[in-house]
Amino acid sequence: MGARKKIHSRGKTFLATLGSLLLGFSVGLGGKILYEVKSFQPYSWDDNPPIVLNCYGEDFSELQMVRAIDYWVVRGYNIGFYEHNPPPTVCEQKDLMGFIILRKGNHRQLDESTLASTKRKTFGLVITSAEIIYRPGSFNLDLINEHELGHAFGFNHVEEAGHIMHPLYHKMGKGFWKPE
């Protein structure tokens, strides 16, 4: 009987510990999601400006990206440099720390109505890498590169007409301000 009580007691301790861990994880994850939803810029790069790599391909417009980078530079968000023709071995890498990588998407990577999508990797509140995936040809649309670089810099959507970070393309504009 003593061995059974010991096993039963260990089982209760294990379940209580597991329950506490799951509860703590859930509360932490919920707090992180709430922070992301409520913040205009929940994450940012550290003091080293990111490097932008064109892994989309040679048909990506260098002029369009340079214009988009300039849009953010005049607002105080810097890029280390832009590499229009990086080596293929670099483009084969995923989640390169310190880089914003531009890629051509395929029909499985983007929803039907999505022109481009930016994914950020973070450590704490610091962005470590970002990847912008474009629907083929959408990089030529006015302001799309500026908008996606905004996400790569850590900004979320702002549902105010004329704002560069508006989620709907037809309501996007050249304006940038931090919402109240």
Where are these regions (language model features)?
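N-terminal Lys/Arg-rich, disordered targeting/topogenic segments
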Residues: 1-10
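Metalloprotease/metallohydrolase-associated module, dominated by Zn2+-dependent proteases
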Residues: 2, 24, 28-32, 117-140, ...
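Disordered inhibitory propeptide/activation segment of secreted metzincin zinc metalloprotease zymogens
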Residues: 12-60, 69-70, 74, 108-125
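Short, structured coil/loop segments at alpha-helix boundaries
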Residues: 54-62, 87, 141, 176-179
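Metzincin-family zinc-dependent endopeptidase catalytic domain
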Residues: 62-148, 152, 156
